[in-house]
């Protein structure tokens, strides 16, 4: 059996190893996630220095190792230099990479995930610089598509309680819909309030306050099965719901009237949902928070 193999892949994460090496986590379409040592990558003028950078796509020759494989040759196929020139684009790219790292499998083909991630990096890079709203929109689009590929798309077309289709009502300024992360999507607030009212009434009927608090050794245990009242994680208006409902499309739909704060709400809803599904926080999201806080301050 050959001790070397070829793979093409994009660098998702790097770690320092020793005085001059790096450990690179690479997403490949052929073998999924690979962790390999880039020997001497931190040395001045190393041939692997630039090739081991973030979001560089390489054709690799890799030697198998006992615990870690080793990159012996690398030829760069593609880079995304525009991402590093804009903090918002870079933060959004790292955010998406973190989700990919949580989803990707090792020793299994990951072609769809590889192609999808590269496509969304390309779209982010193509944005004009200092386009805060565009970065948020493309980030939300990418997160939604990654969740869809993993089979955990949030439900945004119907109410998770009643099953009725939901349509944003732009004629009512105070119109709102609920979003429940544990339940998996959107909830009509009228249905939710009705369930709460019915639940309280049912509890009062099933468990009346006893008139005489005497012990009842032979009393039977009554088990009551009722629909759980879901936790409302967020409330969103008509614009936020409209934006969420369009994220499943291949391209971002331009909706008149959408503002930065609408996209921020959508991103934060998807962030909560993705973190719940992944079972871990998205650390790069703090960079997005810092970037847009700074942009907001600069525009006041």
From Swiss-Prot:
Q: Which residues form a coiled coil?
A: none
A single BP term in Gene Ontology? double-strand break repair
User: What does the entry list under GO cellular component?
Assistant: bacterial nucleoid
**Cross-referenced InterPro entries, in alphabetical order?**
ARFGAP/RecO (IPR037278), DNA_rep/recomb_RecO_N (IPR022572), NA-bd_OB-fold (IPR012340), RecO (IPR003717), RecO_C (IPR042242)
Taxonomic superkingdom: Bacteria
Q: Does the record carry tRNA-binding as a key word?
A: no
For the keyword Cell inner membrane, the answer is: no
> What keywords tag this UniProt record?
DNA damage, DNA recombination, DNA repair
What function does this protein fulfil? Involved in DNA repair and RecF pathway recombination.
Query: What's the family?
Result: Belongs to the RecO family.
Q: Any idea what this protein is called?
A: DNA repair protein RecO
Task: Give the source species.
Answer: Nostoc punctiforme (strain ATCC 29133 / PCC 73102)
Q: What is the lineage of its organism?
A: Bacteria, Bacillati, Cyanobacteriota, Cyanophyceae, Nostocales
């Amino acid at each position: 059996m050959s001790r070397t193999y070829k793979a093409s892949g994009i660098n998702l994460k790097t770690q320092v190893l020793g005085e001059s090496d790096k450990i690179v986590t690479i997403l490949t379409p052929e073998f999924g996630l690979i962790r390999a040592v880039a020997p001497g990558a931190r040395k001045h003028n190393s041939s692997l220095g630039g090739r081991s950078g973030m979001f560089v796509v390489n054709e690799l020759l890799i030697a198998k190792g006992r615990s870690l494989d080793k990159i012996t040759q690398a030829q760069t196929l593609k880079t995304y230099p525009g991402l590093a020139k804009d903090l918002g684009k870079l933060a959004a790219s790292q955010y998406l990479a973190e989700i990919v790292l949580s989803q990707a499998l090792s020793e299994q083909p990951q072609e769809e995930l590889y192609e999808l991630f590269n496509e969304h990096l390309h779209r982010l890079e193509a944005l004009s610089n200092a386009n805060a709203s565009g970065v948020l929109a493309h980030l939300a689009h990418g997160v939604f598509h990654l969740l869809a590929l993993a089979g955990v798309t949030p439900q945004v077309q119907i109410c998770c309680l009643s099953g009725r289709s939901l349509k944003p009502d732009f004629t009512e300024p105070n119109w709102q819909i609920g979003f429940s992360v544990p339940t998996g999507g959107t909830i009509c607030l009228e249905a939710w309030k009705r369930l709460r009212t019915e639940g309280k009434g049912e509890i009062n009927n099933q468990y009346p306050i006893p008139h005489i608090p005497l012990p009842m050794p032979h009393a039977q245990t009554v088990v009551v099965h009722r629909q759980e009242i879901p936790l409302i994680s967020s409330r969103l208006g008509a614009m936020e719901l409209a934006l969420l409902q369009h994220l499943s499309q291949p391209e971002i739909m331009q909706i008149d009237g959408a503002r930065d704060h609408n996209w921020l709400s959508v991103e934060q809803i998807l962030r909560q949902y993705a973190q719940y599904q992944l079972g871990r926080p998205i650390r790069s999201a703090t960079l997005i928070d810092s970037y847009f806080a700074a942009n907001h301050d600069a525009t006041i």
